[in-house]
Structures are given as C-alpha cells and as structure tokens.
C-alpha cells in the first residue's frame, strides 16, 4: 500500500474517487466550490428529489428519496477550515496526495471522506434494495465551520415549517479517537456564552477613593462563579463547566483606574441544566455582590442526547461487523450541526473517521478507512431500512 499511487487507489475505490474530487475543491467556509453539484448529480441519478437552500453566501442541499417513514438522513458539511501556512504543508492541501497509506488534503478527515462515503453507501444499498421501505435523505451545508447561522439550521427551519420530520440521522463528523470505529457520539453538550460588563468609576490611580475599580468589584463574583458546581451531570454527560475566555479593561496606560471591565465566558452544559436556569443562576450571583452590570447572552446550541435505542444499537452493530470494535458512546467534544437536527429528529448520532488531524496542518485519513466508512454507512442503512434476513 505504501507504494500504491493515488491513481491506482482511485480505480480500486469508488468512495476514494469521489472523495478526491471533493477534496480538490477549495471550499473554505462559506464557499461550497461546487461540491454540492457533484453530490446532487449522483443523488439525482438515484431518484432523489433535490432542493437547494441558499441563504446569503451559504449553499445548503436537501435531498430525499421516498415519502414514507422511517426517514434515515445522512448529514454533513462540504466546507473546510482555511489550510493555514501553505509552506508548512508537505503537499498542496487542495491537491489530494497519497503518502504512506494516508490521503492528505484539507477536509480529508473533516469531513469530505464522510460525504463521499454517504453517497457510495447509498448507491450500493439502492442497487440491492431499490424498493426498500422508508426514505433516505441528505442534508449538506457549506456553513458548518463558520458562524453556522445560514446553514443546517435554515434547512431544519424549512423542514419543520412544513412538518417534515426525520427518524434517524447520522452526522459524518470525525468521531474516532484512537482507532477507526472506536467512538460514536450520541449527544453533545450545549454552548451558552455571555459578555459581562461590570461598571465602575474611572479615575486617577493615585486617588482610588475618588474612583471605583470594576476589576476589584467583580473579582469576588468571578471567584464564586468559577467555584460554583452548576450540576452533577448524568450518566451520559459530565458536569456543566463555566470558563472565562477573555477579560478586557483599562485604557492601556498604568495610571488610570478603568471605568468598566468586560468579561467573556462560556458554559458547556449538559441535559442536567437549561440555558434559562444557568442565566438565572449567574444573575443571582452577580446581584448578591451588588454589582452594576449588564450581560449579553448567546445560546449557540442546546444539548442533545440519543440514548441507547434503534440508531445507537444498529450503528454499533454495523461498526463492529466492519472493524471488529465495539464503539464507545460519547458526548465529549464541541458542538456540531447535530444540535440543530435534533429539533426535527428523534435519534441523532455522529460517526466518522479519526479526528487526530482535523483542522491541523497535513490533515489526513487512512486509505483503508475510506471504504470501511462506506461499508459502515451501508450496513447502517440495511439495518435501519432493510429486511432482517438480508444483510450486507
């Protein structure tokens, strides 16, 4: 495999061939760079109804084949983060390169290989089961790595408005940690950010009695916030955390007491808490310290959880049959578009390649994992939509 050329590998793998075509496209957020066109053409040939949902500079693709339940949806993104310093890459990040059994390119792991595997898995399943029960859907966006305000959330809003709900959704995020197939994400913590401004009175630093230092005033409250146990978590989630990300105050000189301090912070919270409850608790602590303050809140995602059930179990079986591993269910990590999809889908999980190189220089995916990933997705379709006596 180490001496295999990319051309030879592409001939041997339909999934790799499509992944390479996607990876050649410089689809840095929010530019889709034609990735949706490639995928839509393949899906249209399979009988999918295609919808384009463009909002501002963001391209979104919704595709569905069938009208019955259950609905199994593959969800993902075609945008990638910027490559960073090109001179520090061993090869052009938008010219896929095979080296030592690994495919190198920006988006190889996060998550164009998953996008390609979605398509080829569906093609193979439909070749065997054209009259399968239920429906298959795709939800793709070019705005997952950016603000995520015009991407998946907009398509979800449109589907919800017309009463179109999903039963199962597999998001192709790179979830594998140490080896391919070791982790399925069956939930994510919520993310609640706040910008706190504590007001004081500006003055000369030599005359503190004529001023009120907002940093000093806020310090005891900050200490209490940092020490507060917000909840104990639960069997799926660790306890909620509160962390300061930035503190800004002062004029840049050493002889002026600032008139205000701005503190930016973030909660990563579990299903054991609510955003409203956390906001109320913060206000209560700040009020108890007698501060003159204001807060701007931003809830970028609620927590979601898919307990063990049909989707977790069937996908775990598929992973085990392909890799021999029994994946761990995990809710660790940051947010994903699963937080939006959970609003219209009763079971949402994430599964994809190794995540060790994502957003890094020389991002890559192991060549052997490319077809393994497609096989897992195909088996998942079979288990969720196929007959029990006919397995992949």
UniProtKB/Swiss-Prot annotation:
Keywords: Amino-acid biosynthesis, Cobalt, Diaminopimelate biosynthesis, Hydrolase, Lysine biosynthesis, Metal-binding, Zinc. The active site is at 79, 144 (proton acceptor). It catalyses: N-succinyl-(2S,6S)-2,6-diaminopimelate + H2O = (2S,6S)-2,6-diaminopimelate + succinate. Binds 2 Zn(2+) or Co(2+) ions per subunit. Its EC number is 3.5.1.18. GO terms for biological process: diaminopimelate biosynthetic process; L-arginine biosynthetic process; lysine biosynthetic process via diaminopimelate. This is Succinyl-diaminopimelate desuccinylase. The lineage of its organism: Bacteria, Pseudomonadati, Pseudomonadota, Betaproteobacteria, Nitrosomonadales.
């Amino acid at each position: 495999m180490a001496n295999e050329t990319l051309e030879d590998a592409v001939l041997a793998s339909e999934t790799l061939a499509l992944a390479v075509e996607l990876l050649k496209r410089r689809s840095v957020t929010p530019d889709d760079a034609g990735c949706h066109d490639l995928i839509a053409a393949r899906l249209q040939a399979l009988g999918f109804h295609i919808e384009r949902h463009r909002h501002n500079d963001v391209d979104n693709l919704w595709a569905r084949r069938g009208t019955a339940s259950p609905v199994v949806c593959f969800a993902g993104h075609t945008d990638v983060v910027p490559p960073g310093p090109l001179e520090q890459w061993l090869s052009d990040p938008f010219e896929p390169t095979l080296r030592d059994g690994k495919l190198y390119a920006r988006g190889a792991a996060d998550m164009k290989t998953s996008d390609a595997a979605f398509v080829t898995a569906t093609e193979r399943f439909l070749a065997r089961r054209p009259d399968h029960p239920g429906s298959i859907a795709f939800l793709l966006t070019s705005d997952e790595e950016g603000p995520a305000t015009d991407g998946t959330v907009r398509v979800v809003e449109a589907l919800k408005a017309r009463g179109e709900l999903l039963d199962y959704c597999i998001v192709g995020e790179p979830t594998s940690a140490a080896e391919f197939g070791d982790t399925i994400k069956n939930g994510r913590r919520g993310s609640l950010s706040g910008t706190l401004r504590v007001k004081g009175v500006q003055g000369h630093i030599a005359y503190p009695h004529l001023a009120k230092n907002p940093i000093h005033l806020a310090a005891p409250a900050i200490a209490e916030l940092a020490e507060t146990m917000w909840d104990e978590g639960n069997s799926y989630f660790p306890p909620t955390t509160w962390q300061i990300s930035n503190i800004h105050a002062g004029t840049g000189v050493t002889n002026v007491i600032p008139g205000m301090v701005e503190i930016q912070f973030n909660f990563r919270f579990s299903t054991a808490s609510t955003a409203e409850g956390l906001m109320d608790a913060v206000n209560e602590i700040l009020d108890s310290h007698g501060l003159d303050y204001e807060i701007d809140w931003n809830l970028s995602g609620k927590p979601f959880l898919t307990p063990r059930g049909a989707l977790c179990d069937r996908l775990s079986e598929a992973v085990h049959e392909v890799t021999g591993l029994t994946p761990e269910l995990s809710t660790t990590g940051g947010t994903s578009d699963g937080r939006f999809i959970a609003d219209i889908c009763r079971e949402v999980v994430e599964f994809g390649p190794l995540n060790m190189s994502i957003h890094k220089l020389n991002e890559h995916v192991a060549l052997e994992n490319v077809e393994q990933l497609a096989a897992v997705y195909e088996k998942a379709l079979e288990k969720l939509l196929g007959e029990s006596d006919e397995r992949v």
